[in-house]
Amino acid sequence: MSKYDSHLKCSFCGKSQEQVRKLIAGPGVYICDECVELCNEILDEELMDAPAAAVAGGGSPKPDDSRPKRRPSRERLSFNQIPKPREIKKYLDEYVIGQDEAKKVLSVAVYNHYKRLSLASKPGEETSEDHIELQKSNILLMGPTGSGKTLLAQTLAQILDVPFAVADATTLTEAGYVGEDVENILLRLLQVADLDVEEAQRGIIYIDEIDKIARKSENPSITRDVSGEGVQQALLKMLEGTIANVPPQGGRKHPYQDCIQIDTSNILFICGGAFVGLDKVIEQRRGKKSMGFIRPGDTNQSKEKRAADLMQQAEPDDLVKFGMIPEFVGRIPVMASLEPLDEETLIAILTQPRNALVKQYQKLLKMDNVQLEFNKDAVRAIAQEAYRRKTGARALRGIVEELMLDVMYELPSRKDVQRCLITKEMVEQRSTADLLVHPSSLPTPESA
């Protein structure tokens, strides 16, 4: 507030802003920090008295649907409760098929990160030998679209029971330009944590499409690269660890608001991207460029395998050559490469994980008392079509949704259907599914 605002007073207690620590402005009214604290005490007393009043009246307290439900705070993991890398990988195996090397890298990095947090939460137990500072190791996941980058990060957050937020790097721009500020990433995490700052400071943020903020050119340009190098520069401090000011309503539409301060030192950042063309950069570095000729007998699958093998050998210098600035690469020391999904892996994704797509649709139809079956040829045909679409596991849901649309439209209105069978012909020709009706619903010879 300016020096001309010394006359401002709290609308509730009448104290001037000089008499209180904080005066919060609203539309035509003001409230001081002391009144806010008093309101919190009153609400806490009412919440504590409600169960007692209900017991005295012989009944249970009626839920007040108008009051927002506060999520119970997560119990923080002690050192002994942190799952070991083998346990983390085993849990990931239940939800994500393949990508064993990436799972190992993630499991070790996440285990070490939360060991670091448990050490920081026990300052009283330090000895003279414990003054070694453990630095944060953010993670970079490289792999084609639909290979499981986001799912891996999301599953990690589930096993650790920490807040998790996903951000899209393509929407970010430097401050002052059209687009989102980098602080909006922290705002998403804060919202997931129900505005609990301490909880948010232990969370995981996954920044997708990170390769899209690569520099447009290796040479400095006269024009400002506000969505490329500029965003990388803006993310540097956040990745390393800083006290960031986060506007709770978004900074650009509500510029005059009190910001929430978040320490990003203990937030784990996982960045993911396809990095299309990085394999060629690695190939040039290794001196194995094939002068533009294609070897006879090369198939799309063998080309993808070669590209995936090259991505496994990526080094920080390759990322700099690709367009990431050295300072940014240095703040993401852990790198893992995901392999493209082949036909057999897509088949496994359809049927094996705990929440496999086939199991999800079987559960949906079971609620309508219908047994859903996919024969083996149908599953393979779905995987083959998904492989041709080149969008990884994401294509599977789209294909199954197309197949099941008519079935899910008709079945809720029919009580005579007992079983639904999806065949290869239905997948390839989009023909009608085979429906088996209850024997009791069949016409009898007398009625026929």
From Swiss-Prot:
Instruction: Offer an example of a GO molecular function term for this protein.
Output: ATP hydrolysis activity
Q: Which UniProt keywords apply?
A: ATP-binding, Chaperone, Metal-binding, Nucleotide-binding, Zinc
CDD domains found in the cross-reference section: RecA-like_ClpX (cd19497)
The keyword Zinc is annotated on this UniProt entry:
yes
Q: Cross-referenced PROSITE patterns, in alphabetical order? A: CLPX_ZB
Superkingdom of this protein's organism: Bacteria
What disulfide bonds does the UniProt entry report for this chain? none
Recorded GO CC terms: HslUV protease complex
So what family is this one in?
Belongs to the ClpX chaperone family.
NCBIfam families of this UniProt entry?
clpX (TIGR00382), PRK05342.1 (NF003745)
Specify the protein name: ATP-dependent Clp protease ATP-binding subunit ClpX
Q: Give the species this sequence originates from.
A: Rippkaea orientalis (strain PCC 8801 / RF-1)
Query: Gene encoding this polypeptide?
Result: clpX
